[in-house]
């Protein structure tokens, strides 16, 4: 009987990526299969996030529920990973005696040996160190799970915004070598992946080593990935404005695989608040990036992050944010009420904006961006959009579901054979959270056919050294 693993994930896309790697690791380690039911599992893993308010208490509430399962099954192993584990590992162990493993984002690859220690009668294991980017060398080969895949290209952040815990929980910026990334994506493409989303806390700060000891910039990486046969759509997240250089903007001008959509967090439209946040740029510099992007790619749509009610935010500061929103015309946003994160510089500032004022401002901001997004959706009526078909529709399994370049969900009727491929769909209806379309053409009528498979590319460029170690030479 196979052993079962249950993973509960909170937080950003990086955490989702890490959880998928944990599942692959545990499958390779002892054939663990994932289960949605915690009560069925032999190992429970909680991948935590410290961005939101009361993150630590949320962890203890969850562990309290799992403690009851361990009382019924003493052999059950419970592990806590992610950013709260990295920041509060010792506190977790002191308050939750049921926890066996505590590991950070950079040490998840050590899970099998930690579990072996526990099974051998060892005490609870805590490993929240920052061993550079070692984890990528220890993880199993990538496995595709649908036509779209996330690939982490770097870890950590060195910007130290005053409100953010990421540099303290994930460490400084460290980039993966170029060859490792290209090899992983080529392997995914060979398994049917058509869309890749490059991941990093500050993805456009990527500076990866090449095989000849040069440094590959993020703009160069984008072009390398876009050139891989089978990868017809390319995304990345999350970016920082101060790293959004002209060479990246130039890629939008000549690389059609790069989607006409960008998530570029700004947090505030007030120069005074941006300075308090230690963002390193002013509102006009952010707008300059958007202006140059739209010159290079006129149809590009922008989403962003906003923090509402940062300490000292006045009515004029909020008005400046709304002015930026009006000037840029965002398609989407992730907007949140400010809450202090322990250990950050901003936590020492007086939180002098009332909760009622924060809620009112948040509602105003979200309402305005919803209006802007709806306007963009209506502009798509009657247009033909290229959709990557992900699978059956959630609401109607007799229909198919896919996404546009701008990540809008489109439901439409078509043959299931199109799942995993691109189709063209005419948009006929617009709803708040999705679009409806009619099938126009399949991939066999498009100019997307591969002339060379990723396997051919890998075979062409593989070289074994004297020790029999395979290297990928781009």
Curated annotation (Swiss-Prot):
GO molecular function, one term: metal ion binding
Function summary: Catalyzes the methylthiolation of N6-(dimethylallyl)adenosine (i(6)A), leading to the formation of 2-methylthio-N6-(dimethylallyl)adenosine (ms(2)i(6)A) at position 37 in tRNAs that read codons beginning with uridine.
Any one GO CC term of the record: cytosol
Domain TRAM as annotated: residue spans: 378-441
Keywords carried by this UniProt record: 4Fe-4S, Cytoplasm, Iron, Iron-sulfur, Metal-binding, S-adenosyl-L-methionine, Transferase, tRNA processing
Cofactor note: Binds 2 [4Fe-4S] clusters. One cluster is coordinated with 3 cysteines and an exchangeable S-adenosyl-L-methionine.
Boundaries of every MTTase N-terminal domain copy: 3-120
Chemical reaction(s) catalysed: N(6)-dimethylallyladenosine(37) in tRNA + (sulfur carrier)-SH + AH2 + 2 S-adenosyl-L-methionine = 2-methylsulfanyl-N(6)-dimethylallyladenosine(37) in tRNA + (sulfur carrier)-H + 5'-deoxyadenosine + L-methionine + A + S-adenosyl-L-homocysteine + 2 H(+)
Membership in a protein family: Belongs to the methylthiotransferase family. MiaB subfamily.
Organism: Shewanella sediminis (strain HAW-EB3)
Domain Radical SAM core, first and last residues per copy: 143-375
Name of the featured protein: tRNA-2-methylthio-N(6)-dimethylallyladenosine synthase
Predominant subcellular localization, coarse grouping: cytoplasm
Database matches in SUPFAM superfamilies: Radical SAM enzymes
PROSITE patterns: MTTASE_N, MTTASE_RADICAL, RADICAL_SAM, TRAM
Subcellular location: Cytoplasm
InterPro entries xrefs: Elp3/MiaA/NifB-like_rSAM, Methylthiotransferase, Methylthiotransferase_CS, Methylthiotransferase_N, Methylthiotransferase_N_sf, MiaB_methiolase, rSAM, rSAM_horseshoe
Record gene name: miaB
Positions of [4Fe-4S] cluster 1 binding: 12, 49, 83
């Amino acid at each position: 009987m196979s052993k079962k693993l249950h993973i509960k994930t909170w937080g950003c896309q990086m955490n989702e990526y890490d959880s998928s790697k944990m599942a692959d690791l545990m499958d390779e380690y002892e054939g663990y299969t994932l289960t949605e039911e915690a009560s069925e599992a032999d190992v429970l893993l909680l991948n935590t996030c410290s961005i939101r308010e009361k993150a630590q208490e949320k962890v203890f509430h969850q562990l309290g529920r799992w403690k009851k399962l361990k009382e019924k099954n003493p052999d059950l192993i419970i592990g806590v990973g992610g950013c709260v584990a990295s920041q509060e590992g010792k506190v977790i162990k002191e308050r939750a005696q049921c926890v066996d493993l505590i590991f950070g984002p950079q040490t998840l690859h050590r899970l099998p040996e930690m579990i072996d220690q526990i099974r051998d009668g060892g005490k609870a294991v805590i490993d929240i160190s920052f061993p550079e980017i070692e984890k990528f060398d220890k993880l199993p080969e990538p496995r595709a799970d649908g036509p779209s895949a996330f690939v982490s290209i770097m870890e950590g952040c060195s910007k130290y915004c005053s409100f953010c815990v990421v540099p303290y929980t994930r460490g400084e910026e460290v980039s993966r070598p170029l060859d490792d990334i290209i090899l992983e994506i080529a392997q995914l493409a060979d398994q049917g992946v058509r869309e890749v989303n490059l991941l990093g806390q500050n993805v456009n700060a990527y500076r990866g080593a090449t095989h000849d000891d040069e440094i590959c910039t993020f703009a160069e990486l984008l072009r390398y990935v876009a050139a891989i046969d089978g990868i017809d759509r390319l995304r990345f997240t999350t970016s920082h404005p101060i790293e959004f250089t002209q060479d990246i903007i130039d890629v939008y001008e000549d690389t059609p695989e790069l989607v006409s959509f960008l998530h570029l967090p700004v947090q505030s439209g007030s120069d005074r608040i941006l300075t308090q946040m230690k963002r390193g740029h002013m509102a006009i510099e952010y707008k300059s990036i958007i202006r140059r992007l739209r010159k290079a790619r006129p149809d590009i749509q922008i989403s962003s992050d906003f923090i509402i009610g940062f300490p000292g935010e006045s009515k004029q500061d909020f008005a400046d944010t709304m002015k930026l929103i009006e000037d840029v015309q965002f398609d989407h946003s992730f907007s949140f009420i400010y809450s202090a994160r322990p250990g950050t510089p901003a936590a020492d500032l007086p939180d002098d904006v009332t909760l009622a004022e924060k809620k009112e401002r948040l509602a105003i901001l979200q309402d305005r961006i919803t209006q802007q997004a709806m306007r963009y959706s209506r502009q798509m009526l009657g247009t033909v959009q290229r959709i990557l078909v992900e699978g059956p529709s959630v609401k109607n399994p007799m229909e198919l579901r896919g996404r546009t370049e701008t990540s809008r969900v489109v439901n439409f009727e078509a043959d299931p054979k199109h799942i995993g491929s691109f189709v063209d769909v005419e948009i006929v209806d617009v709803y708040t959270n999705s679009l409806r379309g009619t099938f126009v053409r399949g991939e066999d009528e498009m100019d997307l056919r591969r002339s060379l498979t990723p396997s051919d590319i890998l075979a062409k460029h593989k070289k074994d050294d004297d020790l029999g170690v395979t290297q990928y030479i781009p």
